[in-house]
Amino acid sequence: ETVTGVINGKVKGGFTVELNGIRAFLPGSLVDVRPVRDTTHLEGKELEFKVIKLDQKRNNVVVSRRAVIESESSAERDQLLENLQEGMEVKGIVKNLTDYGAFVDLGGVDGLLHITDMAWKRVKHPSEIVNVGDEITVKVLKFDRERTRVSLGLKQLGEDPWVAIAKRYPEGTKLTGRVTNLTDYGCFVEIEEGVEGLVHVSEMDWTNKNIHPSKVVNVGDVVEVMVLDIDEERRRISLGLKQCKSNPWQQFAETHNKGDRVEGKIKSITDFGIFIGLEGGIDGLVHLSDISWNVAGEEAVREYKKGDEIAAVVLQVDAERERISLGVKQLAEDPFNNYLAATKKGAIVTGKVTAVDAKGATVELTLGVEGYLRASEA
């Protein structure tokens, strides 16, 4: 039987309830469907109770508010299950938070609001979006009537920011965004609510390809980036940071011509040549074959060491491939060309035999100039 009463006191194990002049006992476990420590908000109000025990001889009455709530919830639950449809919007109370989402009480039925369906932007923890006790409106994404499982969405209440994003941000567009996350391979930049793009580490700096993102930007920084590529289907945007800065390779190409003299310090020496540091933080390569006219590259390179100041001539600039070819020997005249200019065809010359093979002999005519004497001509 359901009766109306008022909670008017606290006793061991529960509370006292006045039922039209009759004193009843309300066990603490039967106040609500969930444990209630503080009943201040309930005291003094007329509430519905169900009599679960009545002993007239001992004048002992035990009531339950929980039974009334469960009965009402059951009716509400049945009605909700009957009317619930995928795609509809419903209101609910956030009941519990987990690392993967939030459980929402829709009225006798709990639905899961997964963390990936809370917002279009990256969410690290559900508490960033909702809190226990919040009343929220959600959309029913999936409803398994047999298993009574409901999947809910919050972000689906708004428009998907990825729709037609390529039209809003064509390749080459420059825009500002906020750095939201750093990884070893780059940084993520939010260019609008719910849309993040990746700036790969190779697109951060023109001259340092292996720099760690933390050396360039910090989380929270507002930066200018360029849209390099958009894959709407996979929801991926490639962004560039360095493209919003002047390209030192292009600048060098615009200010230097083939044959120009440049100077710099040796940054490194490898098996194939010498790298020279140039203005703008870029490097140029002197190949072994371009070190000396007279000495083999492997021997000539031994005359140099890292840190040496060195001059060279610009041989070729490929700004697109970020390559600059330099030459040291080109600072001096080519002895071969000089020899040809001074020696006419048919002239008799002298030389020193430096090598002999089955087909003939190699003859040094002058420093840096060799000729080959075939055996048939000897």
Swiss-Prot record:
Keywords: Repeat, Ribonucleoprotein, Ribosomal protein, RNA-binding. The lineage of its organism: Bacteria, Pseudomonadati, Pseudomonadota, Gammaproteobacteria, Enterobacterales. Binds mRNA; thus facilitating recognition of the initiation point. It is needed to translate mRNA with a short Shine-Dalgarno (SD) purine-rich sequence. GO terms for cellular component: cytosolic small ribosomal subunit. It comes from the Bacteria. This is Small ribosomal subunit protein bS1. GO terms for molecular function: mRNA binding; structural constituent of ribosome. Residues 1-66, 87-155, 172-242, 259-329, 346-378 form the S1 motif domain. Belongs to the bacterial ribosomal protein bS1 family. PANTHER family: 30S RIBOSOMAL PROTEIN S1 (PTHR10724), SMALL RIBOSOMAL SUBUNIT PROTEIN BS1C (PTHR10724:SF7). It holds the Pfam family S1. InterPro entries: NA-bd_OB-fold, Ribos_protein_bS1-like, Ribosomal_bS1, Ribosomal_protein_S1-like, S1_domain. One of its GO terms (biological process) is translation. The gene is rpsA.
